[in-house]
A protein has these predicted regions:
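Membrane topogenic helices and adjacent juxtamembrane segments
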Residues: 4, 12-51, 157, 182, ...
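Residue-identity detector for threonine
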Residues: 16, 30-32, 44, 91, ...
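A subset of signal/propeptide-processing and intrinsically disordered low-complexity segments
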Residues: 17-24, 55, 68, 105
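Hydrophobic transmembrane alpha-helices
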Residues: 27-92
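Membrane-embedded alpha-helical hairpins and interfacial helices in multi-pass inner-membrane proteins
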Residues: 57-71, 95-197
Length: 197
């Protein structure tokens, strides 16, 4: 016969004001640890966009039109290393640089290029472990086509001439110089430690 006597059930810890205060402090500490990360991502995207817009303005004569050797696009080489902040920074930078008030001669029609810029920057980031150069090349071709259509709409320029010329300019800045920037910064390793992805 089992003579063991079961004791009373364990009493849960008392919900004292001191205990609640301690739990609130722990929650605040967790939030404080997370929030700097978010602020770093937001500030990185903002700095990237500002740099893009500044470079587009500085090299305005060659950043638009048929030449379209937009030096600002060199920054896209940082997208595979930084990730989402750079994708958003690239998109916001294009949005700012393509404003008519900012000096874009094409007018509002050039704002359509914000969408492919976002999509192909995101694709570049997704391809970071497969082929960065392929991602940069796809970005160049896609933007070469959409910018050429914008030029055709604004100035009635022939697409057969525009697409190769515009794509070549974007390719040089993006796939060639952007890839060189990617290789150089990757070799340093600093961004990989700041933005592990």
């Amino acid at each position: 016969m089992d003579r063991r006597v079961s004791g009373p059930p364990p009493v849960p810890p008392l919900e004292t004001p001191g205990r609640r205060r301690e739990e609130n402090i722990n929650e605040k500490e967790t939030t404080t640890v997370r929030s700097p990360r978010r602020s770093v991502l937001i500030s990185t995207a903002a700095v990237y966009a500002a740099m893009y817009a500044a470079l587009a303005l500085l090299f305005n004569p060659i950043s638009y039109g048929v030449i379209n050797l937009r030096v600002a696009n060199v920054l896209i080489g940082l997208v595979p290393l930084i990730g989402w902040p750079a994708v958003l920074g690239q998109t916001l930078g294009v949005l700012i640089a393509n404003q008519p008030a900012f000096g874009d001669p094409l007018g509002p029609i050039d704002l359509i290029n914000v969408a492919p810029s976002f999509l192909f920057s995101l694709l570049l980031w997704k391809l970071r472990n497969k082929s960065v150069f392929l991602g940069l090349a796809l970005y160049s071709v896609a933007l070469g086509i959409t910018v050429s259509y914008a030029l055709n709409y604004a100035f009635n320029l022939p697409l057969l001439v525009e697409i190769p010329q515009v794509t070549a300019g974007i390719f040089i800045a993006t796939a060639v110089l952007g890839y060189l920037l990617f290789r150089a910064v990757k070799r340093l390793g600093a961004l990989q430690r700041m933005f592990p992805n």
